[in-house]
Amino acid sequence: MRAQPAASHFVDGRPLEDETGAPIPVIYPATGEEIARLHEATPAVIEAALASGARAQAAWAAMRPVERARILRRASDLIRAHNEELSLLETLDTGKPLQETLVADWASGADALEFFAGLAPVVTGETVPLGQDFVYTIREPLGLCVGIGAWNYPSQIACWKAAPALALGNAMVFKPSEVTPLGALKLAEILIEAGLPPGLFNVVQGRGAVGASLVTDSRVAKVSLTGSVPTGRRVYAAAAEGVRHVTMELGGKSPLIVFDDADLESAIGAAMLGNFYSAGQICSNGTRVFVQKGIKEAFLARLAERADAIRMGDPLDPEVQMGPLVSQAQLEKVLAYIEKARAEGGRLVCGGEASVSPGCYVQPTVFADVTDAMTLAREEVFGPVMAVLDFETEEEAIARANATDFGLAAGVFTADLTRAHRVVAQLQAGTCWINAYNLTPVEAPFGGVKLSGVGRENGRAAVQHYTQVKSVYVGMGPVDAPY
């Protein structure tokens, strides 16, 4: 099989196999070909990963931050040097076209490692003067962390979680999605090649039961999950039993508001990026596109032209712009949402069908005349299906944009920057864009509010989620006791 790794797991600095675990077939979604076969982590594999991580963490935390930074920077350089082959593997694992994976996946992971390498040596505490006494604070690592990844950006997510954890002196056991398990193994190999001591980044494969075993282990201090809201609820509850630190980056049903003074081509381009990039399988997608009534029909006409011109096909073809969904199960789910939208009265503007057999393809799809009550406007589809809703006033757009249990992201397109800032100040979302969409530089915090999650990834804000503060009171005089 063309993408078979050396072993299913990577523990304590080397590949580890245990073929008694349940098989995990890895399917290339463009063709249905089985490209690798892994095995689920057994209790022995899980124990080895947790034990080696706990054992290695103390010495790593004691290392000078600048030395930790050098290792992470070398890992970043190695990723960039091997970006082409890593991107090819990402395409086979996910079905995303090379046109995307070459610029968006491992490249973002390398950025994260480099950014947190630079941040590690400058994370400091503070001094609080109290007369002749004083208090100083120390930012300390949490200890052993568990990362649980999603299948849509498997390698990027692994890097986004590993980079701050390792830079700040923690160890991590990472469980990728069983749907896209290959990239995390490569990251583990790269980190060892860069000089990371064994045990600090371990990878174990498996489904929900493996994740549950990791999350509930008494040695684990922190859990970081990227996934769906139902999965997040379960993991959050399990982590709470041990009063563990958590970061949850969950689902979204994000609004993209287009006012009638917006640059139409830019707004349409953003709506397409926010619905069709990665075949629509992005948590922050702006899947509720609110368009002011005066420009709605012009917006839809031009959108249909551009959507129909998207090149679909073999993800390994560098000219292809959109690949398949990640799996047959996801394809069936998305097609069911399309049929539901038809049944509930949505006006199909373009797409709406499965495409390019035998892979898991669906056409870029746009529904107009969508109302807030329709399923398409309320539930996360996670496929290339855009809902276009119209509005009249700014106040109406804000109220309807916020009328959701999600709060991951939002976007505003307008030529009036005063209005843009006024609107985003009222949007209930963790990440907002003005005249742009779905750009997530590692220098900026990323995360949601409401059911879209807690905590933040990336930026300086991530430091708070992988460290804890110790306060030290220093008495400079005799103790004055009343007895």
From Swiss-Prot:
Q: Per its UniProt record, what Pfam families does this chain match? A: Aldedh
Cofactor dependence is on:
K(+)
Q: Where does K(+) 2 bind?
A: V243, K450, G453
Q: Does the keyword Nucleus apply?
A: no
* Domain of life of the source: Bacteria
Q: Where is the active site?
A: K161 (charge relay system), E249 (proton acceptor), C283 (nucleophile), E457 (charge relay system)
- Residues modified as Cysteine sulfenic acid (-SOH): C283
The note on cofactor binding and number reads: Binds 2 potassium ions per subunit.
Provide this UniProt record's keywords sorted from A to Z. Metal-binding, NAD, NADP, Oxidation, Oxidoreductase, Potassium
Role of this protein: Involved in the biosynthesis of the osmoprotectant glycine betaine. Catalyzes the irreversible oxidation of betaine aldehyde to the corresponding acid.
Show the PANTHER family listed in the entry. Answer: ALDEHYDE DEHYDROGENASE-RELATED (PTHR11699)
Q: What is this protein called?
A: Betaine aldehyde dehydrogenase
Organism, per UniProt? Cereibacter sphaeroides (strain ATCC 17023 / DSM 158 / JCM 6121 / CCUG 31486 / LMG 2827 / NBRC 12203 / NCIMB 8253 / ATH 2.4.1.) (Rhodobacter sphaeroides)
